[in-house]
Amino acid sequence: MHWQYAVFAESGFSQEAAAYTNPGMQANLVLRVFFGILAALCCLVPMKLLWRNGELAAAIFCLDVIILNIFYTVNALIWQDENVGNWWPGYGWCDLQVYLDYALDTLYSACVFEIMRNLAAKVALSRVTGLTSGEKRRQTLISALVLFPIPLFQVAFTWFILSQRYSVAPLIGCLSIYDSSWPYLVFYVLPAPLYTIAGVIAAGKPLLAASIRPNEKNRT
């Protein structure tokens, strides 16, 4: 591919690259926009229903997917070819995305973990009745404490981790450029996979419990 990333700084942006596009990029653009809009629309109704039922993690998961797909779709429409000279520099729009980039990815994984944890807790209930209003409020509070602290910290700490303002690429749009340091590794790279691993463990607990119970009954 004979294209290059256009790196934007405070002083302005480069206009050296010539306009360029090809059928592959056009197909990529169409698919990105179509599936991005479709995915966002498909999440609207579930998000409303889950929010009404007090399922905070699942509702935030849907909202996270909607926001990410809006970013992907709008970015593809704005920077749909390699005509760097005519590109919009992305001031404001890319600044917003840079601060939300890792936070949204981490929130996505945190939601998956919290959904699995809540499902495991509900499967483990031995009573027939549902949760009381007090238990639901407590569950919502715990979910909020699981979901939001790390993403909010990432948003607040982003300015200290960036090595430059941002860069822009065709179809992808805004890109974050981070400094290669241990805070970046610990507070930005590791949280999402750790949440994912914890989600797998939480999902496996009911299966493990179900496999242990028959063995205990057989022993008695």
Question: Across the structure, where does each feature detected by a protein language model lie?
Answer:
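Fourth transmembrane helix
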Residues: 133-169, 196
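Transmembrane alpha-helical core residues of multi-pass small-molecule transporters
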Residues: 64-67, 150, 191
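Extracellular-loop-to-transmembrane junctions of the mid-late helices
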Residues: 154, 158-161, 169-209
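Generic alpha-helical transmembrane segments of integral inner-membrane proteins
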Residues: 37, 41, 70, 149-156, ...
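Intracellular effector-coupling site of seven-transmembrane GPCRs
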Residues: 214-220
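Membrane-proximal first intracellular loop
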Residues: 1-144
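C-terminal membrane-anchoring module of eukaryotic surface/secreted proteins
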Residues: 34, 50-53, 152, 180, ...
